[in-house]
């Protein structure tokens, strides 16, 4: 978010504001910001503009019509539907969304506190738009919302026209007389607290039934599962579905304060807590098969496999976190996918296993890019299309038929489907969840990040090690003598000048000063620029440096032949004060 200055006339709302507005930015996961800056006015301006954009689209592209129902829901963050005294009294974001829906000529329908995929699925089935108020996995002091067309998520191509309408709406609303405006000088509704309409439960029921119907005839009987509830909006739904499908479920860890769970960045403290849950449940109930959970808005799964040794007749559990990119492989195999789309950050076990022939070109990171890739696969005639992200959020780009049951396409991240597919794959193959994952190619991943890392610095790091020629997507270094092969995003070889080759070699040499052989890295064999800088080493290590798309964070993704090595790469990356990422940042400053 960055401040805005707009010429104002005396008596206009903009002139009456007692703060400097920070406009929300369009991102691949919607619009997010610090709650202290999320005035109801700012939410309203953006939502009105996005609704106007949806109304401008033809029906076949997900357009909506004035007078239609428009669905909305929220997660369990305090600011989503209540004022938060700890965050400057901001909040009641859902109330601002509801008013924007009304003023855009739509009929708002509150589906309550349900998972993002539950809202999206319900709206798509009815050819209606939707908005989810959520900050997903980010800390509670941040929040936001995500708009869906009647077909699904907004995509990257929508960004420019949406932002143009936001600018127009901002100017129009700021220019209104302050005395007649809905908003006070603090950017909040003059009317104060507003109670939302009682939620309709039909969206929740439909989401539960979606999975009960698809897995009818199959049972999880005999599975003992821990459901880590924390503050996930889908915590009760998760327990309900698992129990209805026959599992014994032990709910644990329920929290009435918001707990940010980033399924792509489970730290040691979180993993230790979940292992404690496993040990306590095992001692009380006997051996458990897995711990399952989701992030805050329940569109990303979290799965911990549990295998047990028995010593003197007593179970000793061994719990292992299963990366979302590996969860996606098991899920797509179970569903019989003939096309799979993943971002470049995913574990490359996919490239080596049973789905390698179904693999479409890897995309940039973010569900809109995965969705665009799935649409390309559909255009090529593929009929069982799946996609997923490294965080485990799983998308279906086509209807999926299995055992004479049909699962309707849901082109947005979902946590419930991968959790269920992993469990049923385990049952069908007569293996524990851990044994099931042990059959995958032996490639191990880990991600970590530095928080409060200025985005401008992150972008400079990426730019420093990126060729100026924008067509270059891949650099291959097949020999140590200095040959370089250049490829574009379609994997077509590019001709290159001597200057291009020298620059590529300089980039490799520069990166080698940070990813040192003394730290276990081999010579650099390839660099990919699909999203950030992804570095491949001759010893099969992979290190990927990328700025977060929606926060001041710099991430490092690692893939290696052992989990220990993947963990070591991320530790080297985020170590303080002299890890690789900090060293890269310092190298930008003149000595």
Spans of model-derived segments:
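An N-terminal, well-structured beta->alpha segment
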Residues: 2-97, 178, 183-222
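Phosphate-binding and adjacent anionic-ligand microenvironments
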Residues: 288-290, 314-317, 337-549, 553-557, ...
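Gly/Ser/Thr-enriched, mixed-charge loops and adjacent short helices
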Residues: 12-23, 143-285
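N-terminal small/polar loop signature for handling phosphorylated ligands or for N-terminal nucleophile
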Residues: 71-141, 238-312
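Glycine-rich phosphate-binding loop plus the immediately following alpha-helix
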Residues: 153-181, 325-357, 415, 420-424
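Buried hydrophobic positions in well-ordered alpha/beta secondary-structure cores of metabolic enzymes
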Residues: 29, 72, 119, 131, ...
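Short glycine-rich phosphate-binding loop at a beta-alpha junction
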Residues: 62-75, 109, 224-227, 338-344, ...
